[in-house]
Amino acid sequence: MANIVFKLSDKDITTLMSRISFDTENLPQGMKARAKYQNTTVNIYQSGKVMFQGNHAEAVSEELLPQHSQLNTNKTKKKNMANSFLEQTLMYDQFNCIGSDEAGSGDYFGPLTVCAAFVTKEHVPILKTLGVDDSKKLTDTKIVELAEQLVTFIPHSLLTLHNEKYNIQQAKGWTQVKMKAALHNEAIKNVLEKIDSSQLDYIVIDQFAKREVYSHYALSDIPLPKKTKFETKGESKSLAIAVASIISRYAFVTYMDQISKNINMTIPKGAGAKVDVIAAKIIKKYGLSRLDTISKKHFKNREKAQKILKPL
């Protein structure tokens, strides 16, 4: 199935929407309008990007956006030439892969989020056009923009371990490695239920532990062990991992924004000195028990925040 993306001005989007009938209600977050036309899905996003999906995507885009279609084709050819070496080095992008990654493990505040995503060879050009990259290189704003588009067409599973449950499991002796292994394995199994596994070439996990350690903590067997690979710096080696990273980071960032609104403070990410100061302010205003509902209790920040409040 072909996927073609354009970046349009508000004027061009208005013109496009006047040419065929679009639905504008009950749409996923981040989507402005959607239409079905000649066996092709046309998605218009709030970001100004328009995606054509389907076997006739190219023909439909040429019909509805004749001028832009030709410009986009020329740009794509140039970009493909520039990326030719990159495509040779990214082996996994030549195959249909499930990638998995997590967010929040190094942050005192907020949950642990894990995503697994299925990316096919056909998805690769559209993902590159959208600008999918290592989430650590992307701003939070860009992550939100990308994720809201990705979740509309990439089969995925997103799991969130909220702080209260996280702290309960940690108190029982669960390490972060055990939590992540269990969540990654569950997310991967969820995605396998959504796809035809005969089309799957590899499962690529952004490595946080060696295979034997992962297998020990995963709570259940690795679904397809012969197809499963563990890669350090996986986001730079597999677009499937990059997509999973963006979606998991999106969930984490969104939750952090919600925490900030709920307590009327800007909650910093990470586990540095700024985090200690904000944690101390939360204890002073709301109490230690409230702090524990939005943070990971075993981090040293909790102790440091309490020391800040002690009189000199």
UniProtKB/Swiss-Prot annotation:
Manganese or magnesium. Binds 1 divalent metal ion per monomer in the absence of substrate. May bind a second metal ion after substrate binding. It comes from the Bacteria. One of its GO terms (cellular component) is ribonuclease H2 complex. Its main location: cytoplasm. The keyword NAD does not apply. CDD domains: RNase_HII_bacteria_HIII_like, RNAse_HIII_N. The keyword Nuclease applies. GO terms for biological process: DNA replication, removal of RNA primer; mismatch repair. It holds the Pfam family RNase_HII. Keywords: Cytoplasm, Endonuclease, Hydrolase, Magnesium, Metal-binding, Nuclease. It catalyses: Endonucleolytic cleavage to 5'-phosphomonoester. It is found in: Cytoplasm. Signal peptide: none annotated. GO terms for molecular function: magnesium ion binding; RNA binding; RNA-DNA hybrid ribonuclease activity. Its EC number is 3.1.26.4. Transmembrane segments: none annotated. Its cofactor is Mn(2+); Mg(2+). InterPro entries: RNase_HII/HIII (IPR001352), RNase_HII/HIII_dom (IPR024567), RNase_HIII (IPR004641), RNase_HIII_N (IPR024568), RNaseH-like_sf (IPR012337), RNaseH_sf (IPR036397), TBP_dom_sf (IPR012295). Endonuclease that specifically degrades the RNA of RNA-DNA hybrids. Belongs to the RNase HII family. RnhC subfamily. HAMAP family: RNase_HIII. This is Ribonuclease HIII. It comes from Staphylococcus aureus (strain NCTC 8325 / PS 47). The lineage of its organism: Bacteria, Bacillati, Bacillota, Bacilli, Bacillales. The gene is rnhC.
